[in-house]
Amino acid sequence: MEDRNLERNIGSDISSSSSIDMSQSTNLEISIDQSINRNLEKIDISEDDVRRGEKKIESFENGENNNNNNNNNNNNNNNNNNNNNKNEDRKFKKTLFCIKMYIIQYFKKWLGTGKDKRPPIPDLEEIGWTWLASFTGILVLALIHYREALDAQMQVLIGSFAASAVIIFGVPKSPLAQPRNLIMGHFLSAVVGSVIRVALVYTNANFEVACALAVSLSIMLMQFTNSLHPPGGATALICVMGVEQRWRGFYFIFVPILSGALIMLLTALVVNNFARKRSYPLYWW
């Protein structure tokens, strides 16, 4: 019984002490709030001050953002400059490499593609027919030239016909030896040479330019008309370089060029087809 009474007394003391502590803490909090409110009432802050403070904060934040942006831009510019420099270096090295390879490939062409593509040597029969056909063709022109043409102050035999003899009698199967190329090649080249002679030579123009222009234009015209015949370039040059008065104007186109080319064609038709292994022409036009 005594123990129970003791426990009751102790419990009542603890409860009374706890209630006292709670009331004291509540009073302390109230006093702190009142002091804070009194201090806040003493501070006089206007709306303008608040706005100015907000602006300062915003400007400070914007300044930091601008600084960050500037730093980022500078870094980006540096990176771009570095990338541009690297790209320029790559382009320069690539250009040097391309030039180097072009030079190497260019001089490799001087070495040729190999002896395996060289045409075989013709047999004795083919060589014999080439000699006979070329001898006959030039002989016919020479006879007409020295026996008939000179007496009439005409010319039938010129140097470019010797080059034509090599083609139409030496390689009669070549596209350059066919009748279209033989006739049109000489004819067009003679026209070009005559025009250049009249336009430049007889107007006291540059004679060197006239020679080069006659040959180059004749080659271009033959290629354009698919009638390329290498001796035609010589025909154009002879036309420009001739000093005989009878060559003045366009008479040179018909005599000796067109007439001589027809005589060469007739000789090729007769002699080439006598050969067992030859058939001329492959086509006419």
Swiss-Prot record:
| Principal cellular location given in the protein's record | membrane
User: What's the name of the protein?
Assistant: Transmembrane protein DDB_G0269096
- Location within or outside the cell: Membrane
Q: How does it sit in the membrane?
A: Multi-pass membrane protein
Q: Which GO terms describe its cellular component?
A: membrane
TM annotation in the entry = 124-144, 152-172, 182-202, 205-225, 250-270
Q: Where is the composition biased (Low complexity)?
A: 12-25, 65-85
- The organism is Dictyostelium discoideum (Social amoeba)
- Keywords, comma-separated and alphabetical: Membrane, Transmembrane, Transmembrane helix
Keyword Lipid biosynthesis on entry: no
